[in-house]
């Protein structure tokens, strides 16, 4: 069982690396089995992809589940640290953005893979519902700060995808991650939510 877990781990990490580096065209069965990493006293073979995952597409899905779970827990920690968004919404959302942004920029390879899968036919066909269910808790935590008519899930989806778009530009050297640019990036994301946020209660 330990060896099986090690083989699965190696294949998942290979998938993440290859998809991040060159997309799904790069992540062939041969490359998935042999691109990097090794286990002592063991010779990797493509057959293990089919034995443990059924297909390379199922391996792609397993890699996304790994990354989606990592992202969820990073966001969940941010929500728990802030402890609610009802008061001082913009300030607290800014703190949440800072934590999320730091996580995304600190995990370039994993986030490149995440984005490539997220915009692929594999996500639409295999992972969308599981992703929505996983992030229900984050949506629920943020729902109280939005107006009743707001589609909170759709708004947060737009904000998070925009954040990843900015991150890709940083990875590619098109945008500098700086003290000057960071507030501007947050303001763009905040403006995507502002119309739908509840007004703060006025002091009597």
Q: What residue ranges belong to the model's regions?
A:
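Hydrophobic/aromatic-rich alpha-helical bundle segments in the mid-to-C-terminal region
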Residues: 112-116, 132, 143-190, 200-204
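Hydrophobic alpha-helical connector segments
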Residues: 62, 66, 76-106, 155, ...
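Generic hydrophobic, amphipathic alpha-helix propensity
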Residues: 7-16, 32, 63-67, 71-75
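Short secondary-structure transition hinges
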Residues: 58, 101-140
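N-terminal intrinsically disordered/low-complexity leader segments
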Residues: 1-6, 200-204
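Amphipathic alpha-helical packing segments from all-alpha helical-bundle domains
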Residues: 69-77, 122-147, 153-157, 183
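Secondary-structure edge/capping motif, primarily at the C-terminal ends of alpha-helices
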Residues: 78-85, 111-122, 170-174
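Helix-turn-helix
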Residues: 10, 18-58, 62
């Amino acid at each position: 069982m330990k060896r099986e877990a090690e083989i699965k781990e190696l294949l998942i990490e290979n998938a993440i690396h290859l998809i991040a580096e060159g997309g799904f065209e790069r992540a062939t069965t041969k490359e998935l089995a042999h691109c990097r990493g090794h286990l002592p006293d063991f010779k990797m073979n493509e057959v293990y992809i089919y034995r443990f995952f059924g297909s390379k597409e199922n391996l792609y899905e397993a890699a996304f589940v790994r990354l989606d779970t990592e992202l969820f827990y990073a966001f969940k920690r941010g929500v728990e640290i802030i402890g609610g968004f009802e008061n001082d919404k913009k300030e607290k959302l800014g703190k949440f953005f800072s934590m999320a942004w730091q996580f995304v920029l600190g995990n370039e390879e994993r986030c490149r893979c995440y984005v490539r899968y997220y915009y692929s036919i594999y996500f639409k066909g295999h992972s969308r519902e599981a992703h929505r269910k996983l992030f229900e808790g984050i949506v629920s935590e943020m729902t109280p700060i939005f107006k009743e008519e707001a589609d909170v899930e759709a708004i947060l989806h737009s904000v998070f995808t925009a954040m990843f778009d900015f991150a890709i530009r940083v990875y590619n050297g098109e945008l500098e991650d700086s003290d000057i640019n960071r507030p501007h990036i947050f303001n763009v994301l905040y403006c995507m939510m502002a119309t739908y946020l509840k007004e703060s209660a006025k002091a009597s």
